[in-house]
Amino acid sequence: MSKTRVYELAQQMGIDNKELMARLADAGVSVKNHMAVLEDSDIKALSAPAQTPHKEVSQEEVRVKPTLIRRRAKAVEPEAAAAEAAPAPAAQEEAPLKAEPEKVEPEKAEAPKPRQAAEPVRARIIEAAPVPKPAAAPAEAAKPEKEKPAEPAPAPKAAEAPAAPAAEAAPAPAPAPTEAPAAKPEAPAPTAPAAPVAAAPAEAQAPAKVEEPEPEKATPTRARILGRVEIPIPAQRPAERREYQRTAPGERPAPRPGMPRGVERPGTERPAPRPGGPRPAGAPGRPGERPTTGRPGGPAGGRPDRPAPLAPIDAPPLLGDDRRKGRKPAPAGGTDYAKNGKKGAPAAAGKGKKETFKDILDKRERVFEPGPRSKGKKGKYEKVQIGKKTEITVPKAIKRIIKISESITVGELAKRMGIKATDLIRALMKLGVMATINHPLDFDTATLLATDFGYEIENVALDVDEILEAEPDAPESLLKRPPVVTIMGHVDHGKTSLLDAIREANVIAGEAGGITQHIGAYDVELNGKKITFLDTPGHEAFTAMRARGAKVTDIVILVVAADDGVMPQTREAVNHSKAAGVPIIVAINKIDKPDASPGKVKQELMEFGLVSEEWGGETIFVEVSAKKRINLESLLEMVLLQADVLELRANPEKAARGTVVEAKLDKGRGPVATILVQEGTLKSGDYFVAGVHYGRVRAMQNDRGEKVLAAGPAMPVEVIGFNGVPDAGDIFVAMGDEKQAKEIANHRQMKLRESELAKHSKLSLEQLYEKIQKGEVKDLNAIVKGDVQGSVEAVAESLRKLSTDAIRLNVLHASVGAITETDVNLASASNAIILGFNVRPEVKAAALAEKEGVDVRLYNIIYDAVDDIKKAMEGLLEPTFKEKYLGRAEIREVFSVPKAGMVAGSYVTDGKIVRNAQVRLLRDNMVVYEGKLGSLRRFKDDVKEVATGYECGMSLENYNDLKVGDIFECFEMEKVAGKL
């Protein structure tokens, strides 16, 4: 015979060693460990084929209380039960129910029946209601009252399969005997194994007899079918093998599902439970009490007028046969009902599964069992799956799409994907990218990473350009609009004076130094026609302003002084106008001056392609005088004529779009911006976005301070309602709602912050080395505050241009508004100076600046600010040392003086010799020594200096190698202030 070890058989079956040992124990084969040797008979007992079960019907019942009988039968339809019961022999069908006690073993002893394996059958748990005493009561359920707490002996396994068909024939409640317990049945002698087979047909009719319902209390006596479950019945075990059981005093052996029962030896009896034995969990008298180790939901008794709740159907199985076969766990107690037969207590006595569960705990893991179901509820416990491995779930396809906005950090991407950040960092290293958890990833890199982990990246970045893209207008919706005219030219050529004369106002009187330092927008009406003027600064620092003015304008008036001619800013204005493709009208101003030369101006402008119409060109030239108001109307007529030629049109019925011409921070009104509406109509209450700021139009004013409710195309207005001061030149767009405007502004702020962080990124090793090499470079930090955004921008740009290789000027902060305590604190922390342009510090800020020693400088003319900063930067430069020649003396004689060393008698040939100066010793025009004079004497007196033509005695410090003919050259080093 071939011998097989336990672990070899487990490998062949594809199961664990412990699981195979548990199956062997269930089959009655005792093994010590996984190295135990199995005989062929053991293997056959473990995997015996299924056989057709006997037609014996085992009616298992237990009297929980006088009016409640718990029964277990096959769970099929009544018609199927009748069909199954038909093949039974006639003699078996005629067996009366009253003869049942003769074939049924009492609780104390019961003959085992040979068990045959059958296909999985269905079982029902039927709860019977109290009924009157029937004519014939099944004696198998009779039990003395005093033995109620005791536990019945287990039924043979052979009754397990036949018990199921009995339930099919008895869907109606069966009568429960009430007085049978009074008569104690005698215990017949044990029978041979064949006796139960013969008794089985008689038992098959028992459910049929009991099936007849009582007419009394039809509703209460109706049985409730709580569930239906597949119960696998293992194959029959060879009869010659003894059943492996452990029997303790006062309790029956523990039945195991799937364990074939052997045939009991004749002449032996099972020990019956003693009346005073321990009460099992869920025994009668404790309704609803949860069994500790037994089957959940054991019956509760104690009151004869109320049935106990049945066990929950969906409790997990206590043994693993079903689980091993891949089936769903059988309902708690279902397997025991089928196995216990007619007298194997259906766990109602509480101890039905106690031993089994303990055996399981010895062989398998502990299983959680829910407590008993509360009375009156029909719900089921959730099934507790045991022994399952952790299942790796894969998210749905829609869950594997990650939406990002242009960029995402490594940590955020890992969180969205549900993986560890270290895994992403490791994947980035493979791609050659050294990143940290806060490292931002662009869309392409994130896509590569996500693909490796089975995810997709979707770019949901806000497309600002697409949202703010101007929609083309239909030709029929375009209406004529006023022209926008920008006045440009060199400083002091009379641009603002000309505009004042046109507007009949005195704007220049309010400008510091008589020069324009911010851009202005004005609306002028001439003969019923409107013209919008933009006045730009002419100073070189305001190049950006002039460029913005040229971009938003339709016509440029180039002002040139007749007595000064073309200047640098004049050339710049011409270049800006040509770059913007704007037509130019030349206004030759100051023709009232005696030295005016309009012809010279026309000739100089020809170099730039501006040829007068009088000379055959296309450029309009008008000779005007702003001071004397000469030819002003002619100039305006030329402007209107040029506008008619351009056919300027716009759609006033759409959302407003425009440009921020100028912006400032008003103490009472907050941020105020001058907006030039270019298309559409801006109304009060409209939401808008401009650059990184957004807001709502709270109020609008024109250039005269009058309140305006709506501003159409080519109309300049001051808008109040920004959440911050916008930059001059920002595009102003009216939005449909605040949410969209805020979203766009926040998106732009994020992009601006990213660009600023990129500028201040960490130094590379090469950059660090260069910085160390340039350690002598000094920094001057400055904070710029101004009245309007354009002026602040101009001053900051002028200061940045002052930076050199020796000293670098850093503008830490530039904003609009008064100098505040925050500015002073920033300056104190960074050792910066504060430059105020047309603003004053607050009282508290001034006191704090004095306390902290912060240098605050106030200006109203840009020239002064630039000059002072130059001086401050020069003060930071290290002074240079320059050698200054003093004189020369020739050694005529050398003397040795005690305690003084060698003394040279010299004659001063040039300049003078100074006592504290430095001296060189020259021999054959070669420097032999350079140091200081030790002494300078004339005769015996120490002197400070000796002039030309005099003799003196000289000695050197720590040097005595003096020879006749050597030359003393006297000099000194003087400091020279550094220059930029």
Curated annotation (Swiss-Prot):
Belongs to the TRAFAC class translation factor GTPase superfamily. Classic translation factor GTPase family. IF-2 subfamily. Residues 514-518 are annotated as: G2. PROSITE patterns: G_TR_2, IF2. Residues 489-496 are annotated as: G1. It comes from the Bacteria. Residues 535-538 are annotated as: G3. Keywords: Cytoplasm, GTP-binding, Initiation factor, Nucleotide-binding, Protein biosynthesis. InterPro entries: EF-G-like_DII, IF2_II, IF2_N, P-loop_NTPase, Small_GTP-bd, T_Tr_GTP-bd_dom, TF_IF2_bacterial-like, TIF_IF2. GO terms for molecular function: GTP binding; GTPase activity; translation initiation factor activity. Residues 47-382 are annotated as: Disordered. GO terms for cellular component: cytosol. Coiled coil: none annotated. Residues 53-64, 95-113, 209-219, 262-272, 352-368 have a biased composition (Basic and acidic residues). It is found in: Cytoplasm. This is Translation initiation factor IF-2. Residues 625-627 are annotated as: G5. It comes from Geobacter sp. (strain M21). SUPFAM superfamilies: Initiation factor IF2/eIF5b, domain 3, P-loop containing nucleoside triphosphate hydrolases, Translation proteins. Residues 480-647 form the tr-type G domain. One of the essential components for the initiation of protein synthesis. Protects formylmethionyl-tRNA from spontaneous hydrolysis and promotes its binding to the 30S ribosomal subunits. Also involved in the hydrolysis of GTP during the formation of the 70S ribosomal complex.
